[in-house]
Protein backbone atom coordinates (compact mmCIF):
# COMPACT_ATOMS: atom_id res chain seq x y z
CA UNK A 1 0.00 0.00 0.00
CA UNK A 2 1.42 3.40 -1.00
CA UNK A 3 1.16 6.37 1.32
CA UNK A 4 -0.89 9.45 0.39
CA UNK A 5 1.92 11.71 1.60
CA UNK A 6 4.48 12.20 -1.15
CA UNK A 7 7.66 13.00 0.73
CA UNK A 8 10.98 11.23 0.05
CA UNK A 9 13.30 11.32 3.05
CA UNK A 10 17.09 11.33 3.12
CA UNK A 11 19.23 10.20 6.05
CA UNK A 12 19.38 13.66 7.69
CA UNK A 13 15.70 13.32 8.62
CA UNK A 14 16.38 10.18 10.67
CA UNK A 15 19.66 11.49 12.10
CA UNK A 16 17.79 14.58 13.36
CA UNK A 17 15.26 12.27 15.03
CA UNK A 18 12.11 13.37 13.20
CA UNK A 19 8.98 11.25 13.63
CA UNK A 20 7.62 11.61 10.10
CA UNK A 21 5.77 9.76 7.35
CA UNK A 22 7.12 9.27 3.85
CA UNK A 23 9.30 7.16 1.62
CA UNK A 24 12.99 6.38 1.66
CA UNK A 25 15.34 4.13 -0.28
CA UNK A 26 17.50 1.07 0.51
CA UNK A 27 20.72 3.11 0.21
CA UNK A 28 19.43 5.66 2.75
CA UNK A 29 18.63 2.81 5.15
CA UNK A 30 22.23 1.58 4.70
CA UNK A 31 23.55 5.11 5.41
CA UNK A 32 21.89 5.40 8.83
CA UNK A 33 24.46 3.88 11.17
CA UNK A 34 24.31 5.49 14.64
CA UNK A 35 22.28 3.53 17.18
CA UNK A 36 19.55 6.06 18.04
CA UNK A 37 18.90 7.05 14.42
CA UNK A 38 18.82 3.38 13.41
CA UNK A 39 16.28 2.54 16.14
CA UNK A 40 14.07 5.46 15.03
CA UNK A 41 14.30 4.45 11.36
CA UNK A 42 13.51 0.78 12.07
CA UNK A 43 10.57 1.80 14.26
CA UNK A 44 9.18 4.10 11.52
CA UNK A 45 9.54 1.31 8.95
CA UNK A 46 7.93 -1.36 11.15
CA UNK A 47 5.02 0.95 12.03
CA UNK A 48 4.39 1.61 8.33
CA UNK A 49 5.09 5.34 8.61
CA UNK A 50 8.10 5.02 6.32
CA UNK A 51 8.08 2.85 3.20
CA UNK A 52 11.38 1.68 1.71
CA UNK A 53 11.15 1.72 -2.10
CA UNK A 54 13.83 1.25 -4.73
CA UNK A 55 13.58 3.73 -7.63
CA UNK A 56 13.37 2.54 -11.23
CA UNK A 57 16.40 2.44 -13.51
CA UNK A 58 14.70 5.01 -15.76
CA UNK A 59 14.28 7.47 -12.89
CA UNK A 60 17.92 6.94 -11.84
CA UNK A 61 19.02 7.63 -15.42
CA UNK A 62 17.02 10.89 -15.53
CA UNK A 63 18.55 12.02 -12.22
CA UNK A 64 22.09 11.16 -13.34
CA UNK A 65 21.58 13.15 -16.56
CA UNK A 66 20.38 16.18 -14.56
CA UNK A 67 23.34 15.84 -12.16
CA UNK A 68 25.72 15.71 -15.14
CA UNK A 69 24.19 18.95 -16.46
CA UNK A 70 24.73 20.73 -13.13
CA UNK A 71 28.19 19.22 -12.71
CA UNK A 72 27.22 17.62 -9.40
CA UNK A 73 27.33 13.95 -10.37
CA UNK A 74 30.62 13.46 -8.49
CA UNK A 75 29.22 15.18 -5.38
CA UNK A 76 26.13 13.00 -4.98
CA UNK A 77 26.23 9.68 -3.12
CA UNK A 78 24.32 6.64 -4.34
CA UNK A 79 21.79 7.34 -1.57
CA UNK A 80 21.37 10.94 -2.83
CA UNK A 81 20.78 9.67 -6.36
CA UNK A 82 18.21 7.15 -5.11
CA UNK A 83 16.35 9.79 -3.08
CA UNK A 84 16.15 12.10 -6.09
CA UNK A 85 15.15 9.26 -8.42
CA UNK A 86 12.38 8.05 -6.12
CA UNK A 87 11.03 11.59 -5.71
CA UNK A 88 11.17 12.03 -9.50
CA UNK A 89 9.35 8.74 -10.05
CA UNK A 90 6.65 9.41 -7.42
CA UNK A 91 6.38 13.13 -8.28
CA UNK A 92 7.11 13.74 -4.61
CA UNK A 93 8.87 16.35 -2.50
CA UNK A 94 12.44 15.71 -1.33
CA UNK A 95 13.28 16.22 2.36
CA UNK A 96 17.03 16.91 2.51
CA UNK A 97 19.50 19.41 3.92
CA UNK A 98 22.06 18.54 1.24
CA UNK A 99 22.57 21.54 -1.09
CA UNK A 100 23.65 19.31 -3.98
CA UNK A 101 20.44 17.28 -3.64
CA UNK A 102 18.37 20.49 -3.50
CA UNK A 103 20.13 21.89 -6.57
CA UNK A 104 19.45 18.78 -8.68
CA UNK A 105 15.89 18.57 -7.31
CA UNK A 106 15.22 22.07 -8.57
CA UNK A 107 16.66 21.21 -12.02
CA UNK A 108 14.29 18.20 -12.12
CA UNK A 109 11.33 20.42 -11.19
CA UNK A 110 10.97 18.79 -7.76
CA UNK A 111 10.04 20.67 -4.60
CA UNK A 112 12.13 20.15 -1.49
CA UNK A 113 11.91 20.73 2.25
CA UNK A 114 14.80 21.32 4.61
CA UNK A 115 15.49 21.29 8.33
CA UNK A 116 17.87 24.22 7.86
CA UNK A 117 18.03 26.94 5.21
CA UNK A 118 17.68 25.69 1.64
CA UNK A 119 19.23 26.91 -1.60
CA UNK A 120 18.15 30.24 -3.07
CA UNK A 121 19.14 29.61 -6.70
CA UNK A 122 20.35 26.78 -8.91
CA UNK A 123 24.11 26.63 -9.35
CA UNK A 124 25.77 24.76 -12.19
CA UNK A 125 29.25 23.49 -11.41
CA UNK A 126 32.33 22.65 -13.45
CA UNK A 127 35.77 21.18 -12.85
CA UNK A 128 38.55 23.69 -13.58
CA UNK A 129 42.33 23.42 -13.32
CA UNK A 130 43.59 26.13 -10.96
CA UNK A 131 46.87 26.31 -12.90
CA UNK A 132 46.00 26.53 -16.60
CA UNK A 133 42.21 27.07 -16.44
CA UNK A 134 41.32 23.97 -18.49
CA UNK A 135 37.71 22.88 -17.96
CA UNK A 136 36.69 19.24 -17.50
CA UNK A 137 33.30 17.49 -17.67
CA UNK A 138 34.38 15.20 -14.82
CA UNK A 139 37.20 15.10 -12.30
CA UNK A 140 40.40 13.83 -13.96
CA UNK A 141 42.17 10.89 -12.27
CA UNK A 142 43.67 11.91 -8.94
CA UNK A 143 42.17 15.40 -9.27
CA UNK A 144 45.24 16.55 -11.22
CA UNK A 145 45.27 18.34 -14.58
CA UNK A 146 46.91 16.14 -17.24
CA UNK A 147 48.18 19.28 -19.05
CA UNK A 148 49.97 21.19 -16.28
CA UNK A 149 49.88 18.98 -13.17
CA UNK A 150 47.93 21.46 -11.02
CA UNK A 151 44.96 20.51 -8.83
CA UNK A 152 41.48 20.55 -10.38
CA UNK A 153 38.69 22.14 -8.31
CA UNK A 154 34.91 22.13 -8.55
CA UNK A 155 33.70 25.74 -8.96
CA UNK A 156 30.41 27.41 -9.91
CA UNK A 157 30.02 28.18 -13.60
CA UNK A 158 29.73 31.84 -14.48
CA UNK A 159 26.19 32.93 -15.18
CA UNK A 160 25.64 34.48 -18.59
CA UNK A 161 23.43 37.54 -18.69
Swiss-Prot record:
Instruction: For the region Zinc ribbon, give the residue spans.
Output: 124-159
PANTHER family in alphabetical order:
RNA-BINDING PROTEIN NOB1
Protein's recorded name:
Endoribonuclease Nob1
Role of this protein: Toxic component of a type II toxin-antitoxin (TA) system. Processes pre-16S-rRNA at its 3' end (the D-site) to yield the mature 3' end.
Positions bound to Mn(2+)? 10
- Any single Gene Ontology cellular-component annotation: preribosome, small subunit precursor
Gene Ontology BP, a term? maturation of SSU-rRNA
* Cofactor binding note from Swiss-Prot or TrEMBL: Binds 1 zinc ion per subunit.
What the entry lists under HAMAP family is as follows: VapC_Nob1
Where does the PINc domain lie? 5-103
Q: Which organism is it from?
A: Pyrococcus abyssi (strain GE5 / Orsay)
Q: Where are the transmembrane segments?
A: none
Q: What's the gene? A: nob1
Q: Domain note for this entry?
A: Has 2 structurally independent domains; the N-terminal PINc domain which binds Mn(2+), rRNA substrate and probably has endoribonuclease activity, and the C-terminal zinc ribbon domain which also binds rRNA substrate.
InterPro entries hit by this protein: NOB1 (IPR039907), PIN-like_dom_sf (IPR029060), PIN_dom (IPR002716), Ribonuclease_PIN (IPR033411), VapC_family (IPR022907)
- EC assignment: the record states 3.1.-.-
Which Pfam families does this one have?
Answer: PIN_6
Question: What segment(s) does the record annotate as region Flexible linker?
Answer: 118-123
Amino acid sequence: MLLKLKLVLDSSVFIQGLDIEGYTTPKVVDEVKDRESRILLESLISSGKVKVVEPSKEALRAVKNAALKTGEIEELSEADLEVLALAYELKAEVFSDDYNVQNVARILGLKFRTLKRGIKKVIKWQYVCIGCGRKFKEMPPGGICPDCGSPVKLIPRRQRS
